[in-house]
């Protein structure tokens, strides 16, 4: 049975990495958590770069009709900045342990 060794840990990515390392097991993790995580022992990335693993982030201002406490003007300003050339540059330059964490692709 393929799922015989499957474990659902019900925790965040950092805790999941800790459990996988403690069990000497495999897990799927996002790159930024993997890079930021300090206790990797001898574990390493064994597979990466396949398009189905692409973990894209998006930004969507929330409608004040649905969420009355939303600050729409501020949300639009943040969205526009993140999608701007300067925002995309800042995202691309954000690094941890000398590794780029995010790869902006706004069009």
What label would you give each PLM region?
Residues 1-107:
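Exported/periplasmic ABC-transporter solute-binding proteins
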């Amino acid at each position: 049975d393929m799922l015989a060794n499957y474990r659902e840990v019900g925790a965040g990515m950092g805790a999941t990495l800790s459990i996988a390392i403690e069990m000497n097991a495999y897990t799927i993790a996002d790159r930024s958590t993997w890079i930021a995580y300090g206790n990797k022992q001898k574990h390493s990335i064994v597979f990466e770069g396949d398009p189905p693993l692409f973990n894209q982030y998006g930004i969507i201002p929330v409608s004040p009709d649905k969420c009355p406490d939303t600050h729409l003007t501020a949300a639009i300003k943040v969205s526009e900045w993140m999608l701007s050339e300067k925002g995309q540059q800042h995202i691309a330059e954000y690094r941890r342990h000398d590794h780029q964490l995010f790869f902006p692709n706004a069009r």
